[in-house]
Amino acid sequence: MQTIIKREGLKRSKFHAKRKETLATLPKYEARAVARFVRISPRKARSVINSIRGKNVSEAFNLLEFSSKKAARIVYNVLKSAVANATNNLGLSEENLYVAACYVNDGPRMKRVWPRGRGRADIIQKRMSHITVIVRDREKENETKAK
């Protein structure tokens, strides 16, 4: 059971307070994008995500563009959003960006009934995913490590 924190008259759970802190502590050379409640199985999305991890953004876009998987189109849009966040919000150059981290978490499951013989029924779980892509500027990251 979550405890409720009262902040400025609003009720917020501990999760929301912690999430706000983690968003504020992102480095200045890092941007991220999250697609939540995507109607694709996490297992199917992970195969696509693993292929772009650690690659330059342009190379990752090429891999996703020519992939025939459904998850590739979704991950392409999330990556595009992360790059837009980096260029517009942080002023980073797209040429120096690379996919620093990307992962897929399980979302909620929609349960459906599939009628079977003799009056029985099976439950089908339609899975959802939360897809996160984090991009970093390679040059600015090296500058901060050198200091």
From Swiss-Prot:
Keywords for the protein's UniProt record, in alphabetical order: Ribonucleoprotein, Ribosomal protein, RNA-binding, rRNA-binding
GO biological process: translation
One example GO MF annotation: structural constituent of ribosome
Domain of life: Bacteria
Cellular component, GO, one term: cytosolic large ribosomal subunit
Residues of the signal peptide: none
Similarity field: Belongs to the universal ribosomal protein uL22 family.
Complex formation: Part of the 50S ribosomal subunit.
Physiological role: This protein binds specifically to 23S rRNA; its binding is stimulated by other ribosomal proteins, e.g. L4, L17, and L20. It is important during the early stages of 50S assembly. It makes multiple contacts with different domains of the 23S rRNA in the assembled 50S subunit and ribosome. The globular domain of the protein is located near the polypeptide exit tunnel on the outside of the subunit, while an extended beta-hairpin is found that lines the wall of the exit tunnel in the center of the 70S ribosome.
Protein name listed in UniProt: Large ribosomal subunit protein uL22
Gene from which the chain derives: rplV
